[in-house]
Amino acid sequence: MASLKSIIRQGKQTRSDLKQLRNSGKVPAVVYGYGTKNTSVKVDEVEFIKVIREVGRNGVIDLGVGSKTIKVMVSDYQFDPLKNQITHIDFLAINMSEERTVEVQVQLVGEAVGAKEGGVVEQPLFNLEVTATPENIPETIEVDISELQVNDSLAVSDIKISGDFTIENNPEDSIVTVVPPTDEPSEEEVEAMEGESATEEPEVVDEDKEDDEEENKED
């Protein structure tokens, strides 16, 4: 379990204060939830990114708040793509024995046999709803697609669960399918079409008629 230090923010801060805070490499955040009151804090952006890379989006973090250490998860965060900057974080204090339902990313593993034969792998479902205690929430759910032929598919019910969690999605929801290759014209057909285009006569414009039309427009 990763640790992250925070500093309590005192008083009401203006937009200018928050801008200055972010420019100094800190991120304004709030802590709320189980066993704690709403507390405004700030954390180091670089350290926060390191922690998320270590524990994952749904990982548990030991957050230092004043003299206390609170077990939290990242409930939400905002990111400014123009400035490439995290602008705000919501830390949710949690009860480690209480189940939570969160979104977990689906990770496809292997190369489908059908894809090697020209088929196209389509993935309509990128995340799954998972219920578990915080320590049992998987970082990702791997789905092996290496045996899939063209026209084969895998649904939620086909997932082999290796952990103490429950998937809440409809068992019939499709996760991945291999569709047949699209029909593309052969090289001969492409050359024939190009030849037809090259031999087409361009439309001849009557210059006198064109001039008359221009005069009529001016009138």
UniProtKB/Swiss-Prot annotation:
Cellular component, GO, one term: cytosolic large ribosomal subunit
Keyword line: Ribonucleoprotein, Ribosomal protein, RNA-binding, rRNA-binding
Region (Disordered) location: 176-219
Keyword match Ribonucleoprotein: yes
Pfam families named in the record: Ribosomal_L25p, Ribosomal_TL5_C
The organism's place on the tree of life at top rank: Bacteria
CDD domains named in the record: Ribosomal_L25_TL5_CTC
Acidic residues bias locations: 184-219
Gene Ontology terms: biological process: translation
GO MF terms held by the record: 5S rRNA binding; structural constituent of ribosome
Classification via HAMAP family: Ribosomal_bL25_CTC
Protein function: This is one of the proteins that binds to the 5S RNA in the ribosome where it forms part of the central protuberance.
Subunit structure: Part of the 50S ribosomal subunit; part of the 5S rRNA/L5/L18/L25 subcomplex. Contacts the 5S rRNA. Binds to the 5S rRNA independently of L5 and L18.
Entry's family note: Belongs to the bacterial ribosomal protein bL25 family. CTC subfamily.
Protein name: Large ribosomal subunit protein bL25
Organism whose genome encodes this protein: Staphylococcus epidermidis (strain ATCC 12228 / FDA PCI 1200)
